[in-house]
Swiss-Prot record:
InterPro entries: Rpn/YhgA-like_nuclease, RpnA, Transposase_31. Its EC number is 3.1.21.-. The keyword Membrane does not apply. GO terms for molecular function: double-stranded DNA endonuclease activity. Transmembrane segments: none annotated. A low activity DNA endonuclease yielding 3'-hydroxyl ends. Upon expression enhances RecA-independent DNA recombination 19-fold, concomitantly reducing viability by 98% and inducing DNA damage as measured by induction of the SOS repair response. GO terms for biological process: DNA recombination. This is Recombination-promoting nuclease RpnB. Belongs to the Rpn/YhgA-like nuclease family. Keywords: DNA recombination, Endonuclease, Hydrolase, Magnesium, Nuclease. Disruption phenotype: A quadruple rpnA-rpnB-rpnC-rpnD deletion shows no change in basal RecA-independent recombination. The gene is rpnB. NCBIfam families: T_den_put_tspse.
């Protein structure tokens, strides 16, 4: 349970009451809807830290969070209580944000399942009754579509079960999907014909090709990579010059990266021995930023 800390006398008096366990217990017992109340073992009401709240939400919430165990004792329930003396149109979304933050904090504590978080709003403003829906889905421009999206499983693109023939029809996504589906295979030479067919379509630009082949190189070994890209170049002569240029550039970048990493290693050894930083930079030709990054 959390209580607002905005600086009004309404908030202050509400907080002064609801910070006490017995008062909080009575509030939940009286006002939580009966079906939800039956889930809670209010004898286990416990004050929890809520330092996990992000800066945007800190202006609305105090450092009080109450949890209760379920009647079956197999899980936790959090009750979020918010006080308002003025109605807020997007209040349900704000409470949802806090609820999700509480769920994440619960997982960060080592639990493996999401807890139930029950938001409640205590209102005593001038406008009566409360004028806005407290279902956050009603706050979308298209509530009906929002209900379809957030009340069912999210779309999944599991490329591992998509047939290669179908992937080949996926236009500008096809080459990426094909490579990522099969990237864990020891030998990618079996994909050469399909890759050549996709290169001919011109759906992949040079930057994407370089990124893709660099990905293949990073996840395999150099010897197999050379055979792989060489075979593609032979099967796609119109792309051969471009592919070999990319391969050469990747090899050069790999060599440069290796030299840079070796320089960083030497610099660290020199610094560990107490040598002057200026001398280290002169010997290794590293920049001050390189040394700062290395120290972290």
């Amino acid at each position: 349970m959390t209580i607002s800390t905005t600086s009004t006398p309404h908030d202050a008096v509400f907080k002064s009451f609801l910070r006490h366990p017995d008062t909080a217990r009575d509030f939940i017992d009286i006002h939580l809807p009966a079906p939800l109340r039956k889930l809670c073992d209010l004898t286990t009401l416990k004050l929890e830290p809520n330092s996990f709240i992000d800066e945007d939400l800190r202006q609305y919430y105090s450092d009080l969070l109450w949890s209760v165990k379920t009647q079956e004792g197999v899980g936790y329930i959090y009750v979020v209580i918010e006080h308002q003396s003025k109605p807020e149109e997007l209040m349900a979304f704000r409470m949802m944000r806090y609820s999700i933050a509480a769920m994440q904090n619960h997982l960060d504590a080592g639990y493996k399942e999401l807890p139930l978080v029950l938001p409640m709003l205590f209102y005593h403003g001038c406008r009566s009754p409360y004028p806005y829906s407290l279902c956050w889905l009603d706050e979308f421009a298209e509530p009906a579509i929002a209900r379809k999206i957030y009340s069912s499983a999210f779309p999944l693109v599991d490329i591992t079960v998509v047939p290669d023939d179908e992937i080949m029809q996926h236009r500008k996504m096809a080459l990426l999907e094909l490579i990522q589906k099969h990237i864990r295979q020891r030998d990618l030479l079996g994909l050469v014909d399909q890759i050549v067919s996709l290169l001919v379509t011109g759906n992949t630009n040079d930057r994407q090709l370089k990124a893709l082949f660099n990905y293949v190189l990073q996840t395999g070994d150099a010897q197999r990579f050379r055979a792989f890209i060489g075979e593609i170049a032979e099967r796609a002569p119109q792309e051969k010059e471009k592919l070999m240029t990319i391969a050469d550039r990747l090899r050069e970048e790999g060599a440069m990266q290796g030299k840079h990493e070796e320089a960083l290693r030497i610099a660290q050894e020199m610094l560990d021995r107490g040598l002057d930083r200026e001398l280290v930079m002169m010997v290794t030709r590293l920049s001050p930023d390189d040394l700062i990054a290395q120290s972290h």
